[in-house]
C-alpha cells in the first residue's frame, strides 16, 4: 500500500522500541520535521529519549503529543507475524504499536507535512512532544519535559494526544479528561507465633479483615458531570511464611484509587488513615501519586476536534474520561486544553495488535483539519 501515513507507521513499527528504548523512532520523526522548519530539541532524561519540536512564532501553541515506546510483545510464536515486522492483511496493519500509538504518530507527522506545505505562513506555533517513556514508569518522559518547559516559561495552549481513544468506529469517542491515580502500600503489623497457640500471637490477617471489609465497601464520592465515582481496587495482598503452622507477623496490602475531581488525593489519604486508626491497627503506609485528574471543558480545542471528526466521519464523538491514565495528566499542568483522539483501541497491548489502514489515513486528515481550525 503506497501511502505516506502507512509507510511511516510501518517504519516506526519495525523498530522494537520496548519502553523506554526508542530504537531510533524519534530520529525518523526528526528527519521528517526538520525540512518543514521545525526547531528540534532533544531532551533525554536517564534512559528515556524525549523530543520537543516547534514551528512558528507568535500566537497560540498547538502541540501534538505521543510516545514511541511500546509494551513487550510476549512470545513471538503467538503472533501470526513477528510483532516488529509490520504486515497488512485484509486492510489491517499488524504489529506491536500499530494502534498504541505508532499509527497515531505517523498520522500526526504526515498531517503536519501537509499542513505546512499548504500554509507555510500559518499563525501561532505547531509543536510536537514525543517520549519513549509512557508505557512503563513514565518518570523520565513527558513529566520531565513539561517541568523543563514550565521552568523556562514555555506556553502551551492546546494539546492533542494521539492515544487510541476510539471504541468501535474511528472518532466515536474522544477523551477530554482522565481520572487521577494514587496507590497505597500498607504494612500491618501483628506478632508471629505458632498456630496452635494463637493467644501468644497476633494475626495481622484477622486484625485487618474489618478494615479491608470497610475499605472495599466505602463510597468515596458520587462522581460529577465529568467523572464516574471514584473507585478503589486491592491489587496485591501478601502475608505468611508459606508454612501452615506459623501465624504471620505482617500483612502487606496494596490498593489503588482512580479518583475524580469530586475528591482530592489528600482526602483519600486522610480517610484511609482514619480507617486504619479506627480499627487500632499498627501500620506503616506509603503513597504514590501517579497523576491528578484533569478535565477539558467546552472551548476552542473541543470544538475543533468535534468539528474535524464529524467533517470526515459524520460522527458526533462521545466525550469520556474513562480508562487509565495518560501523559495528558502532565501536559494539563501547563494550563493547556488537552484532548485525546486516536484509532480504535480493541487490540492494544494484545497479541496481533492491529489498526485499520484506512482509519490511519483518515485520522491524519482529521489531525490536519484540527491544525487548520486552531492555528490558521
From Swiss-Prot:
GO molecular function, one term: cobalt ion binding
One Pfam match: M20_dimer
Biological process per Gene Ontology, one example term: lysine biosynthetic process via diaminopimelate
Entry binding sites for Zn(2+) 1: 67, 100, 163
PROSITE patterns listed in its UniProt record: ARGE_DAPE_CPG2_1
Keyword list, A-Z: Amino-acid biosynthesis, Cobalt, Diaminopimelate biosynthesis, Hydrolase, Lysine biosynthesis, Metal-binding, Zinc
InterPro entries, sorted: ArgE/DapE_CS, Bact_exopeptidase_dim_dom, DapE_proteobac, Peptidase_M20, Peptidase_M20_dimer, Peptidase_M20A
Class of the enzyme per the UniProt entry, highest EC level: hydrolase
Catalytic activity: N-succinyl-(2S,6S)-2,6-diaminopimelate + H2O = (2S,6S)-2,6-diaminopimelate + succinate
Pathway linked to the protein: Amino-acid biosynthesis; L-lysine biosynthesis via DAP pathway; LL-2,6-diaminopimelate from (S)-tetrahydrodipicolinate (succinylase route): step 3/3
Catalytic residues (UniProt): 69, 134 (proton acceptor)
Keyword DNA-binding on entry: no
Co-factor requirement: Zn(2+); Co(2+)
Any coiled-coil regions, as ranges: none
UniProt binding sites for Zn(2+) 2: 100, 135, 349
Annotated cofactor note: Binds 2 Zn(2+) or Co(2+) ions per subunit.
EC number(s) stated in the UniProt entry for this protein: 3.5.1.18
Subunit-structure text: Homodimer.
Function noted in UniProt: Catalyzes the hydrolysis of N-succinyl-L,L-diaminopimelic acid (SDAP), forming succinate and LL-2,6-diaminopimelate (DAP), an intermediate involved in the bacterial biosynthesis of lysine and meso-diaminopimelic acid, an essential component of bacterial cell walls.
Family according to the record: Belongs to the peptidase M20A family. DapE subfamily.
UniProt-recorded name of the protein: Succinyl-diaminopimelate desuccinylase
Source species of the chain: Proteus mirabilis (strain HI4320)
Amino acid at each position: 500500500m503506497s501511502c505516506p501515513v502507512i509507510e511511516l507507521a510501518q517504519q516506526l513499527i519495525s523498530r522494537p522500541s520496548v519502553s523506554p528504548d526508542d530504537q531510533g523512532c524519534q530520529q525518523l520523526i526528526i528527519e521528517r520535521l526538520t525540512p518543514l522548519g521545525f526547531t528540534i530539541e532533544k531532551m533525554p532524561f536517564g534512559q528515556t529519549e524525549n523530543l520537543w519540536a516547534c514551528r512558528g512564532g507568535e500566537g497560540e501553541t498547538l502541540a501534538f503529543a505521543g510516545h514511541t515506546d511500546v509494551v513487550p510483545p510476549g512470545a513471538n510464536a503467538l503472533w501470526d507475524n513477528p510483532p516488529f515486522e509490520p504486515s497488512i492483511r485484509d486492510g489491517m496493519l499488524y504489529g506491536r504499536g500499530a494502534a498504541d500509538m505508532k499509527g497515531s504518530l505517523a498520522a500526526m507527522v504526515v498531517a503536519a507535512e501537509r499542513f505546512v506545505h499548504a500554509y507555510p505562513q500559518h499563525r501561532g506555533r505547531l509543536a510536537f512532544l514525543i517520549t519513549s517513556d509512557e508505557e512503563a514508569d513514565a518518570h523520565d518522559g513527558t513529566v520531565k519535559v513539561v517541568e523543563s518547559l514550565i521552568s523556562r516559561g514555555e506556553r502551551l495552549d492546546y494539546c492533542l494526544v494521539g492515544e487510541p481513544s476510539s471504541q468501535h468506529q474511528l472518532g466515536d469517542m474522544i477523551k477530554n479528561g482522565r481520572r487521577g491515580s494514587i496507590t497505597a502500600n500498607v504494612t500491618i503489623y501483628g506478632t508471629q507465633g505458632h498456630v496452635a497457640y494463637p493467644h501468644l500471637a497476633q494475626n495481622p490477617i484477622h486484625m485487618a479483615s474489618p478494615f479491608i471489609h470497610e475499605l472495599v465497601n466505602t463510597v468515596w464520592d458520587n462522581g460529577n458531570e465529568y467523572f464516574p465515582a471514584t473507585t478503589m481496587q486491592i491489587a496485591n495482598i501478601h502475608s505468611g511464611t508459606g508454612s501452615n503452622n506459623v501465624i504471620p507477623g505482617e500483612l502487606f496490602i496494596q490498593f489503588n484509587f482512580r479518583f475524580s475531581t469530586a475528591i482530592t488525593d489528600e482526602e483519600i489519604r486522610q480517610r484511609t488513615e482514619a480507617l486504619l486508626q479506627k480499627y487500632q491497627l499498627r501500620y506503616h503506609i506509603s503513597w504514590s501519586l501517579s497523576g491528578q485528574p484533569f478535565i477539558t471543558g467546552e472551548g476552542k480545542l473541543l470544538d475543533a476536534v468535534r468539528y474535524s471528526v464529524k467533517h470526515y466521519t459524520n460522527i458526533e464523538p462521545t466525550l469520556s474520561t474513562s480508562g487509565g491514565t495518560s501523559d495528558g495528566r502532565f501536559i494539563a499542568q501547563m494550563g493547556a486544553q488537552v484532548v485525546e483522539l486516536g484509532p480504535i483501541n480493541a487490540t492494544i497491548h494484545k497479541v496481533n495488535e492491529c489498526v485499520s489502514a484506512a482509519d490511519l489515513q483518515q485520522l491524519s486528515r482529521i489531525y490536519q483539519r484540527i491544525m487548520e481550525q486552531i492555528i490558521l
